[in-house]
Amino acid sequence: MIIGVGTDIVQIPRIEKIIKLYPEIFPKRILNTEELKKFALLKKESHVTFLAKRFAAKEAISKAFGVGIGRGINFKDITLLNDELGKPIVKIDSLYTQKLPPFNIHLSLSDDYPICVAFVVVEKIIL
């Protein structure tokens, strides 16, 4: 059973401008500790796309839960990792989601400059 669907589109040049203005503050605002470690290992030319994808994904995830960022789920509550094949894996540590029945999150990310898009389906696990 589908709990919710969310999508978000990010203009990558918008993220570039924000990073130029706030090169240290912006990543710390949207990435949690685990993601910041991964971010630090990236080549500088990969920073913008990495941040744009995470921004779009986290917005789409919060929309799929019907709350939006800052109203039950925050940027740092969501961790985006990848499996060995590169498939996105989502972990959420939020009081809001702890009240929900067990669920899976299906995330698709795509970027083609100047656009990045995230699409999310949250599915209730039927036991």
Curated annotation (Swiss-Prot):
GO process terms (BP): fatty acid biosynthetic process
Binding site for Mg(2+): D8, E59
Alphabetized SUPFAM superfamilies for the sequence: 4'-phosphopantetheinyl transferase (SSF56214)
Domain of life: Bacteria
UniProt keyword Transferase present: yes
A GO-annotated cellular component: cytoplasm
Cofactor(s) recorded in Swiss-Prot or TrEMBL: Mg(2+)
Gene Ontology molecular function: holo-[acyl-carrier-protein] synthase activity; magnesium ion binding
Catalytic activity field: apo-[ACP] + CoA = holo-[ACP] + adenosine 3',5'-bisphosphate + H(+)
Keywords, comma-separated and alphabetical: Cytoplasm, Fatty acid biosynthesis, Fatty acid metabolism, Lipid biosynthesis, Lipid metabolism, Magnesium, Metal-binding, Transferase
Annotated family: Belongs to the P-Pant transferase superfamily. AcpS family.
HAMAP family the UniProt entry points to: AcpS
Identification of the protein by name: Holo-[acyl-carrier-protein] synthase
Organism encoding this protein: Rickettsia bellii (strain OSU 85-389)
